[in-house]
Swiss-Prot record:
Keywords: Cytoplasm, NADP, Oxidoreductase, Queuosine biosynthesis. Catalyzes the NADPH-dependent reduction of 7-cyano-7-deazaguanine (preQ0) to 7-aminomethyl-7-deazaguanine (preQ1). This is NADPH-dependent 7-cyano-7-deazaguanine reductase. Pfam families: QueF, QueF_N. The keyword Cell membrane does not apply. The keyword Chaperone does not apply. One of its GO terms (molecular function) is preQ1 synthase activity. The active site is at 184 (thioimide intermediate), 191 (proton donor). It is found in: Cytoplasm. Belongs to the GTP cyclohydrolase I family. QueF type 2 subfamily. It comes from Chromohalobacter salexigens (strain ATCC BAA-138 / DSM 3043 / CIP 106854 / NCIMB 13768 / 1H11). PANTHER family: NADPH-DEPENDENT 7-CYANO-7-DEAZAGUANINE REDUCTASE.
Length: 277
């Protein structure tokens, strides 16, 4: 049994769980990143990328000092160099534990979230709260050229980096696809997503790139590690000067996850949400 499998044996994901009635930071379940990174040749002490895991939580509520419910949408930014990610069902259960908990101030909610999530992840986690009608939550479109209308024949549905091809021309461009699909490593549930690739380097052949992205269709892994797998393969096969890979996964259980990884200095487009999130 792998180290990851040993860890996931005790995770709430895939198990029946009682929903908490009282605040409980102990519900958060960290998963060390290194166990999944080792097969990719990655070392936490010398990562070839920067990045974050951006989460949105749409089912966040608490009580004010008088017992009146307050609702909000939360955005969390978990750094890619944190020792651990946080298992999604445990995160959901933790947020549900706020439902009947009283807070005097909105800032107290943020302080509590930042403290507890940092403790679980082993690094600072940025927290922002939005009103449910905030314009920042409106869906937007991914920048760049969409690959999805290319006429390609597909043979592979597990990650196949050998599909990637590059030309001799050096370009700087942004490409995206909405055909990304991977699967939860615990439950096997499908994880649907969109992926953006921004780079400067030898021109990626579009047909080959789309075939490669589709090859994740039967792959089982966490969202965060799928993005790291994409990054590692693209760096190895295309050797770009600069690279950003960002996936925006469809919401499940009131949470969506949008990891990005980039070469030093790269940053994703302005925070955005897609229609499927």
């Amino acid at each position: 049994m792998s180290e990851r499998d040993k860890t996931l044996e005790h995770a709430p994901l895939g198990r029946e769980s009682a929903y908490p009635e009282h605040y409980d930071a102990g519900l958060l379940f960290p998963i060390p990143r290194q166990a999944n990174r080792a097969p990719l040749g990655l070392d936490d002490a010398a990562l070839p990328f920067e990045g974050e895991d951006e989460w949105h939580a749409f089912e966040l509520s608490w009580l004010d000092a008088k017992g009146k419910p307050i609702v909000a949408v939360a955005r969390f930014r978990l750094p890619a160099d944190s020792p651990s990610l946080i298992e999604s069902k445990s995160w959901k259960l933790y947020l549900n534990s706020f439902n009947q908990t009283r807070f005097d101030r909105r800032e107290a909610v943020i302080d509590t979230l930042e403290r507890d999530l940092a403790q679980a992840a082993g690094a600072s986690v940025a927290v922002a709260l939005f009103g449910v009608e905030d314009d920042a939550l409106m869906p937007r479109a991914l920048p760049g050229e969409c690959l999805d209308d290319l006429d390609v024949s597909i043979e592979y549905y597990t990650p196949t980096p050998g599909l990637l091809e590059v030309g001799e021309e050096i370009v700087e461009e942004t490409l995206h696809s909405h055909l990304l699909k991977s699967n939860c490593p615990v439950t096997g549930q499908p994880d649907w997503g969109s992926v953006l690739i921004r780079y400067r380097g030898p021109r990626l052949e579009r047909d080959a790139l789309l075939k490669y992205l589709i090859s994740y269709r039967q792959h089982q892994d966490f969202h965060e590690h799928c993005v790291e797998h994409l990054f590692v393969d693209l760096m190895a096969r295309a050797r770009p000067e600069r690279l950003l890979v960002m996936a925006r996964y469809v919401r499940r259980g009131g949470l969506d996850i949008s990891p990005w990884r980039g070469t030093p200095g790269e940053r994703p487009p302005t925070p955005l949400r897609l229609a499927r999130q």
